[in-house]
Protein backbone atom coordinates (compact mmCIF):
# COMPACT_ATOMS: atom_id res chain seq x y z
CA UNK A 1 0.00 0.00 0.00
CA UNK A 2 2.78 2.43 0.90
CA UNK A 3 4.66 1.99 -2.38
CA UNK A 4 1.56 2.40 -4.53
CA UNK A 5 0.33 5.42 -2.60
CA UNK A 6 3.76 7.09 -2.80
CA UNK A 7 3.97 6.59 -6.57
CA UNK A 8 0.40 7.75 -7.25
CA UNK A 9 0.86 10.69 -4.88
CA UNK A 10 4.17 11.78 -6.37
CA UNK A 11 3.33 11.48 -10.05
CA UNK A 12 -0.44 12.17 -10.10
CA UNK A 13 -1.86 13.79 -6.95
CA UNK A 14 0.97 16.24 -6.17
CA UNK A 15 1.13 17.74 -9.70
CA UNK A 16 -2.66 18.24 -9.68
CA UNK A 17 -2.58 19.83 -6.22
CA UNK A 18 0.32 22.05 -7.29
CA UNK A 19 -1.74 23.38 -10.21
CA UNK A 20 -4.73 23.99 -7.93
CA UNK A 21 -2.77 25.73 -5.16
CA UNK A 22 0.57 27.51 -5.42
CA UNK A 23 1.66 26.24 -8.81
CA UNK A 24 4.62 24.52 -7.17
CA UNK A 25 5.24 20.93 -6.19
CA UNK A 26 5.82 20.23 -2.50
CA UNK A 27 9.18 21.65 -1.42
CA UNK A 28 11.44 18.68 -0.73
CA UNK A 29 14.68 20.64 -1.19
CA UNK A 30 15.63 19.93 2.43
CA UNK A 31 16.23 16.33 1.39
CA UNK A 32 18.67 17.00 -1.48
CA UNK A 33 21.54 15.61 0.59
CA UNK A 34 20.04 12.13 0.08
CA UNK A 35 20.75 12.04 -3.68
CA UNK A 36 23.45 9.39 -4.21
CA UNK A 37 24.45 9.45 -0.53
CA UNK A 38 23.92 6.14 1.33
CA UNK A 39 24.72 7.65 4.74
CA UNK A 40 22.11 10.40 4.31
CA UNK A 41 19.58 7.86 3.00
CA UNK A 42 20.14 5.70 6.09
CA UNK A 43 19.95 8.74 8.40
CA UNK A 44 16.66 10.02 6.95
CA UNK A 45 15.13 6.55 6.83
CA UNK A 46 16.00 5.98 10.51
CA UNK A 47 14.40 9.32 11.40
CA UNK A 48 11.43 8.57 9.20
CA UNK A 49 10.70 5.17 10.71
CA UNK A 50 11.16 6.36 14.29
CA UNK A 51 9.66 9.85 14.21
CA UNK A 52 7.40 10.05 11.17
CA UNK A 53 6.04 6.52 10.94
CA UNK A 54 6.06 5.55 14.61
CA UNK A 55 5.47 8.82 16.48
CA UNK A 56 3.12 10.46 13.95
CA UNK A 57 0.89 7.41 13.69
CA UNK A 58 0.70 6.95 17.45
CA UNK A 59 -0.09 10.65 17.79
CA UNK A 60 -2.56 10.97 14.90
CA UNK A 61 -4.23 7.57 14.63
CA UNK A 62 -3.71 6.48 18.20
CA UNK A 63 -4.59 9.75 19.92
CA UNK A 64 -6.00 12.51 17.66
CA UNK A 65 -8.26 10.20 15.66
CA UNK A 66 -9.69 8.63 18.81
CA UNK A 67 -10.19 12.00 20.54
CA UNK A 68 -11.89 13.48 17.46
CA UNK A 69 -14.18 10.45 17.29
CA UNK A 70 -15.13 10.95 20.96
CA UNK A 71 -15.83 14.66 20.45
CA UNK A 72 -17.77 14.23 17.22
CA UNK A 73 -19.84 11.13 17.94
CA UNK A 74 -22.80 12.54 16.03
CA UNK A 75 -20.87 12.79 12.76
CA UNK A 76 -17.83 10.60 13.24
CA UNK A 77 -16.79 10.12 9.63
CA UNK A 78 -16.67 13.73 8.46
CA UNK A 79 -15.44 15.18 11.74
CA UNK A 80 -12.67 12.65 12.29
CA UNK A 81 -11.54 12.71 8.69
CA UNK A 82 -11.47 16.49 8.45
CA UNK A 83 -9.83 17.19 11.80
CA UNK A 84 -7.13 14.54 11.60
CA UNK A 85 -6.35 15.42 7.97
CA UNK A 86 -6.02 19.13 8.73
CA UNK A 87 -3.66 18.44 11.62
CA UNK A 88 -1.64 15.89 9.66
CA UNK A 89 -1.28 18.31 6.75
CA UNK A 90 -0.37 21.27 8.97
CA UNK A 91 2.61 19.40 10.44
CA UNK A 92 4.05 19.26 6.91
CA UNK A 93 3.84 23.04 6.28
CA UNK A 94 7.59 23.11 5.52
CA UNK A 95 6.65 21.57 2.14
CA UNK A 96 4.54 24.56 1.11
CA UNK A 97 0.82 24.77 0.38
CA UNK A 98 0.71 21.88 -2.09
CA UNK A 99 2.64 19.73 0.40
CA UNK A 100 0.15 20.55 3.16
CA UNK A 101 -2.73 19.47 0.92
CA UNK A 102 -0.90 16.37 -0.32
CA UNK A 103 -0.13 15.16 3.19
CA UNK A 104 -3.58 16.25 4.31
CA UNK A 105 -4.95 13.75 1.80
CA UNK A 106 -2.66 11.09 3.23
CA UNK A 107 -4.22 11.49 6.68
CA UNK A 108 -7.54 9.86 5.78
CA UNK A 109 -5.73 7.05 3.97
CA UNK A 110 -3.82 6.14 7.13
CA UNK A 111 -6.96 6.67 9.22
CA UNK A 112 -8.77 4.28 6.88
CA UNK A 113 -6.00 1.69 7.24
CA UNK A 114 -6.23 2.08 11.02
CA UNK A 115 -10.01 1.61 11.09
CA UNK A 116 -10.20 -1.16 8.46
CA UNK A 117 -7.56 -3.20 10.31
CA UNK A 118 -9.51 -3.02 13.56
CA UNK A 119 -7.53 -0.08 15.01
CA UNK A 120 -4.20 -1.75 14.39
CA UNK A 121 -1.55 0.95 14.82
CA UNK A 122 1.16 -1.33 13.43
CA UNK A 123 -0.64 -1.42 10.08
CA UNK A 124 -0.50 2.38 9.83
CA UNK A 125 3.07 2.57 11.14
CA UNK A 126 4.30 0.08 8.54
CA UNK A 127 2.26 1.73 5.75
CA UNK A 128 3.68 5.15 6.66
CA UNK A 129 7.22 3.77 6.91
CA UNK A 130 6.99 2.04 3.53
CA UNK A 131 5.54 5.20 1.94
CA UNK A 132 8.41 7.34 3.29
CA UNK A 133 11.02 4.70 2.43
CA UNK A 134 9.77 4.65 -1.16
CA UNK A 135 10.04 8.43 -1.36
CA UNK A 136 13.55 8.47 0.11
CA UNK A 137 14.75 5.73 -2.26
CA UNK A 138 13.34 7.76 -5.16
CA UNK A 139 15.25 10.79 -3.83
CA UNK A 140 18.43 8.72 -3.49
CA UNK A 141 18.24 7.82 -7.18
CA UNK A 142 17.33 11.42 -8.10
CA UNK A 143 13.94 10.55 -9.58
CA UNK A 144 11.73 12.34 -7.04
CA UNK A 145 10.24 15.48 -8.65
CA UNK A 146 11.76 18.66 -7.26
CA UNK A 147 14.81 17.02 -5.77
PLM features: residue spans?
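Short active-site segment of divalent metal-dependent hydrolases/proteases
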Residues: 56-60, 95, 131
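Functionally important transmembrane alpha-helices
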Residues: 82, 98-147
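Membrane-interface helix/loop boundary segments of multi-pass membrane proteins
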Residues: 55-83, 112-120
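Membrane-interface helix caps and helix-loop-helix hairpins in membrane proteins
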Residues: 90-98
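Juxtamembrane helix-loop-helix connectors linking adjacent transmembrane helices
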Residues: 1-52, 70-73, 145-147
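Residue-level signature of transmembrane alpha-helical entry/exit and packing/kink sites
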Residues: 40-45, 76-84, 99, 103
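Juxtamembrane/transmembrane-helix interface segments of polytopic membrane transporters
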Residues: 14, 65, 139-143
Amino acid sequence: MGVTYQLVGTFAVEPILARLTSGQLPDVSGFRSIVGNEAQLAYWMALSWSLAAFVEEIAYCGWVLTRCAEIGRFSKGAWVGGASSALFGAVHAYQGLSGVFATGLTGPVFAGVYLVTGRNLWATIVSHGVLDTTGFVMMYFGVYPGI
